[in-house]
Regions:
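Peripheral terminal and linker regions in Fe-S/redox and tRNA-modifying enzymes
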Residues: 1-291
């Protein structure tokens, strides 16, 4: 329904008639006439969507593995945690004017398809030796003109404390990050410059949040269960093992190439995950119209 609504107003309100799917797993619509902007926001709201924090020096959208929820190598589904973090960060009164934009990525798989090490904060869902679920936390990654791999600041953090810990991470960045030079304002520059001093300050702030503030952002099991219920897999028809399509011999090579590049294992051994490309001849990768 959300995609259909975007396709409809993308056709009626955009002079170019198409949107753009980006590598950060969202959709951009450019060249919206200012006179139509309010109407577009109203249409988005009808399908529970918005454009809040899609730009500016704030916490942007939370990204994750494109195969989240179906990946065969998944330790835990990262989508409920991504949604919980999205709700925490949206309209956060303390983090609406950071030194620079701030991007968080999370993965629950052994293969890092979300490239979390190249984000301001990268989160790996892992299990410790006792089998308890938690996060490995990296901070200060990024690409651009100064590519940096994130620094590990917590080898294991209990899953229910992730918001309290990120509160400390972003708070110290908000306090210490440079605002005098846009090219030196990302958290990767701060972490590289301060090193252990930044890590120690985050840990001290985190302990203050736990002891003095009463750990206000601790995730309860009930809350995790509530959000997880929004990601229940759809009911699918039983897979028939008797139906199989044949491929003409002259197209077998193309099919084998597609099978290798576009098809991945699924956690349900009877299914496969298929990637559909937006790249077409004669147009920019990611551009898509209503058709």
């Amino acid at each position: 329904k959300a995609i259909g609504t975007q396709a409809t107003w993308g056709t009626t309100h955009l002079p170019v008639g198409y949107g753009h799917f980006t590598t950060r797993q969202n959709v951009q619509f450019n060249w919206i006439p200012l006179t139509d902007s309010a109407d577009v926001m109203d249409l988005l709201a009808t399908v529970n969507m918005h454009g809040i924090q899609t730009s500016g020096n704030c916490i942007r959208n939370i990204t994750t593995d494109e195969l989240a929820g179906v990946a065969a190598d998944e330790i835990a589904d990262p989508r409920p945690f991504a949604e919980i973090l999205r709700q925490w960060s949206t309209l956060h009164p303390e983090f609406a004017f950071l030194p620079r934009k701030f991007k968080i990525a999370i993965t629950g798989a052994t293969d890092d398809r979300a490239a979390v090490r190249w984000h301001d904060v990268g989160l790996y869902l892992i299990k410790n030796e006792a089998g308890e679920l938690g996060f490995r936390v990296l901070v200060g990654g990024g690409m651009g003109r100064t590519p940096v791999i994130g620094t590990e600041i917590r080898a294991f953090l209990p899953w229910n404390q992730i918001m309290n810990f990120l509160e400390a991470v972003v708070r110290v960045y908000n306090r210490w990050g440079r605002r005098d030079n846009i090219y030196k304002a990302r958290i990767k520059i701060l972490v590289k410059a301060e090193g252990q001093r930044y890590i120690d300050e985050v840990e001290a702030e985190y302990q203050n949040i736990l002891t003095q503030d009463g750990a206000p952002h601790t995730i309860t099991q009930a809350e995790l269960d509530r959000v997880t219920a929004c990601f229940v897999p759809p009911k699918l028809a039983e897979v028939s093992e008797t139906k199989a399509a044949t491929v003409p011999a002259e197209r077998q090579k193309d099919y084998d190439r597609w099978l290798q590049q576009n098809v991945a294992s699924h956690k349900n051994p009877k299914l496969r995950a298929v990637t559909l490309s937006f790249k077409r001849l004669g147009q920019a990768p990611g551009d898509a119209d209503a058709d």
